[in-house]
Swiss-Prot record:
Keywords: Actin-binding, Allergen, Cytoplasm, Cytoskeleton, Disulfide bond, Phosphoprotein
Record bears the keyword Glycoprotein: no
Lineage of origin: Eukaryota, Viridiplantae, Streptophyta, Embryophyta, Tracheophyta
Transmembrane parts of this sequence: none
Protein's name according to its UniProt entry: Profilin-2
Protein family membership: Belongs to the profilin family.
Cysteine disulfide partners in this protein: C13-C118
GO terms assigned for molecular function: actin monomer binding
Keyword Phosphoprotein listed: yes
Length: 134
């Protein structure tokens, strides 16, 4: 399966039991910041934004004072899982980023999608990739 198929079929799909509800944007990005696959709506990000995210995975709490920035949008960092998941909130939407052995699985949402639904979609694919050694 191509990386784009993972984005299209597993991240940008309808959320179980909620037809028509889906993430607004998603991507799979290598630890080096290279985009493996993304939705057409995923924001173009700066290398320093991805560097900040990777630093937070290695040094949990790094982004808390400044917020998580992606594509020029600032998200308030909320509880995640140190070294594994970063979650951010902005208004009625937010972001979930799951770190795997080689990549970051990113999902961005707006209402009516809930933070929990975004977490489920992103982390389920991330956990699968971890199980596959990716």
């Amino acid at each position: 399966m191509s990386w784009q198929a993972y984005v299209d079929d597993h991240l940008m799909c309808d959320i179980e039991g909620h037809e028509g509800h889906r993430l607004t944007a998603a991507a799979i990005v290598g630890h080096d910041g290279s985009v493996w696959a993304q939705s057409a709506t995923f924001p173009q990000f700066k290398p320093e934004e991805m560097n900040g995210i990777m630093t937070d995975f290695n040094e949990p709490g790094h982004l808390a004072p400044t917020g998580l920035h992606l594509g020029g949008t600032k998200y308030m960092v909320i509880q995640g899982e140190a070294g594994a998941v970063i979650r951010g909130k902005k208004g009625s939407g937010g972001i979930t980023i799951k770190k795997t052995g080689q990549a970051l699985v990113c999902g961005i949402y707006e209402e009516p999608v809930t933070p929990g639904q975004c977490n489920m979609v992103v982390e389920r694919l991330g956990d699968y990739l971890v199980e596959q050694g990716l």
